[in-house]
């Protein structure tokens, strides 16, 4: 099978893990008036990529994928525990668990997953998304770097979908925003690949506060 098919499969919005249900605080930022137009949305997403994803979420996910690729199960378990402990709010924790569980359900029914990976997956009833994503990449023979690229792309697409539904932002405007953010997306992947574990870390207080406020938001479309 061509590697491109597997990569497109992993990055596809049709992957049945429910990513479209979550906004990661973006819905609250729009509702509160912090984001009122495409320029403000661009600043919010660029900050998330630069200050949060590139410094912690992306390098942690990449480490998951490398450990799964190498079959280093003890290290993968340690990384999964770190990922679970780093969820700062109830909504963000539930998001990771629900999406990870959905991907687990998918992988269990597919023949591509090898026995060692299947045993590890079976030991986690509600794996975090990072663990399940890494095992999916292993099953579909996707390199760790490409698996991270697929995850970053999926994150950006989901955020743009939130903007189109809530701001609202038109489809052509969303594509223009994508073009402006692609260099930042690329830089985030490169930075993630260059960081050693002792340099992982972010202090995304705005994201945590937005997520906590969203938990109490009166009317909402998204689960985070």
Curated annotation (Swiss-Prot):
GO molecular function: nickel cation binding
Keywords from the UniProt entry: Chaperone, Cytoplasm, Nickel insertion
Pfam family, one: UreF
GO cellular component, one term: cytoplasm
HAMAP family assigned: UreF
Protein family: Belongs to the UreF family.
Assembly description: UreD, UreF and UreG form a complex that acts as a GTP-hydrolysis-dependent molecular chaperone, activating the urease apoprotein by helping to assemble the nickel containing metallocenter of UreC. The UreE protein probably delivers the nickel.
Name under which the protein is recorded: Urease accessory protein UreF
Organism in which the protein naturally occurs: Ectopseudomonas mendocina (strain ymp) (Pseudomonas mendocina)
């Amino acid at each position: 099978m061509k590697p491109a098919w597997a990569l497109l499969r992993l990055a596809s919005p049709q992957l049945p893990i429910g990513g479209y249900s979550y906004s990661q605080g973006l819905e609250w930022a729009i509702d509160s008036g912090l984001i009122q137009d495409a320029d403000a949305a661009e600043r919010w997403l660029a900050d998330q990529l630069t200050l949060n994803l590139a410094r912690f979420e992306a390098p942690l996910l990449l480490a998951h994928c490398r450990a799964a690729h190498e079959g280093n199960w003890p290290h993968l378990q340690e990384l999964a525990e770190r990922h679970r402990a780093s969820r700062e709010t109830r909504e963000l924790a539930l998001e990771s668990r629900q999406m990870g569980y959905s991907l687990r359900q998918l992988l269990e029914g597919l023949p591509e997953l090898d026995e060692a990976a299947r045993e590890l997956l079976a030991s986690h009833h509600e794996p975090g998304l990072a663990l399940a994503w890494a095992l999916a990449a292993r099953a579909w023979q996707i390199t760790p770097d490409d698996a991270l690229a697929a995850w970053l792309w999926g994150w950006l697409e989901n955020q743009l979908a939130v903007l189109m539904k809530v701001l609202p932002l038109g489809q052509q405007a969303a594509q223009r925003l994508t073009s402006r953010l692609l260099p930042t997306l690329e830089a985030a992947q490169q930075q993630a690949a260059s960081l050693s574990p002792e340099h992982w870390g972010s202090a995304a207080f705005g994201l945590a506060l937005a997520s906590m406020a969203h938990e109490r938001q009166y009317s909402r479309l998204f689960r985070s």
